[in-house]
Design a protein with these regions (language model features):
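Short, small-residue-biased leader/transition segments that mark boundaries at the very start
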Residues: 1-8
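Short, well-ordered alpha-helices that flank and scaffold nucleotide-derived cofactor binding pockets
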Residues: 9-13, 33, 37, 91, ...
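Conserved S-adenosyl-L-methionine
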Residues: 13-18, 125
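Conserved N-terminal Rossmann-fold NAD(P) cofactor-binding segment
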Residues: 16-58
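Rossmann-like NAD(P)-binding element
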Residues: 40-102
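General beta-strand structural signal in soluble alpha/beta enzymes
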Residues: 47, 63, 105-106, 127-130, ...
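Rossmann-like NAD(P)(H) cofactor-binding subdomain of soluble oxidoreductases
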Residues: 74-142
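Active-site-lining helix/loop region of Rossmann-like oxidoreductase modules
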Residues: 126-186
Length: 186
């Protein structure tokens, strides 16, 4: 996915790694070639469709391996298929790289796919995270617009659940210009 590709490019730009293995059940060679053409010095980029090759002795995994949402689908519609993908991911981690340091899940619904990956991988909760800050960032942006302030003065915005009608907002933690949101919205 482009989100994963962006994360990989940032890692290379920051010098966090010189070895990168791209794995996909469909050939990731096109993405690998695009990254090679970015001209990062001293970087080894491998592309493979073989999970054993990709995961054996991996130290960090960033997975965007879920199916994308199609027109008319809700995020909840993605749940079954993407949780099956997350289950297999967890099993593959347990088999090929049980000593992985950290896994980041960036496919939806991230809260559940992250949990499923965690349960099947045998890893500790501190070793599996999701990139799910989008909703909190959107909340922060909307509050800033609503109150006519900069996003810099909107703090501690937290949400829970997938970004849909079931999502909850923690109004008790959010602050706008240091004032509790709960007191501002009545």
């Amino acid at each position: 996915s482009s989100a994963a590709s962006d994360v990989y490019k940032r890692q290379l730009m920051m010098g966090l790694t010189s070895n990168l293995c791209l794995y996909d059940v469909f050939s990731p060679e096109g993405v690998a070639e695009e990254m090679r053409q970015c001209g990062f010095d001293g970087v080894n980029i491998t592309a493979t469709t073989d999970v054993k090759e990709a995961f054996t002795d991996a130290k960090y995994i960033i997975s965007s391996g879920g199916a994308p949402r199609k027109a008319g689908m809700t995020r909840e519609d993605l749940l079954k298929g993407n949780c099956e993908i997350a289950e297999q991911l967890g099993k593959d981690i347990k088999t090929y790289c049980p000593d992985v340091k950290h896994v980041v899940i960036i496919f939806n619904p991230a809260d559940l796919t992250g949990l499923v990956t965690l349960l099947y991988s045998g890893l500790k909760p501190s070793q599996v995270t999701t990139l799910a800050a989008l909703d909190s960032t959107r909340l922060r942006s909307e509050l800033a617009k609503h109150f006519g302030v900069s996003m810099d003065v909107v703090e501690n915005c937290r949400t829970y659940g997938g970004h849909g009608e079931q999502m909850a907002v923690y109004a008790s933690t959010a602050k706008v210009e240091g004032k509790p949101l709960a007191g501002m919205i009545g």
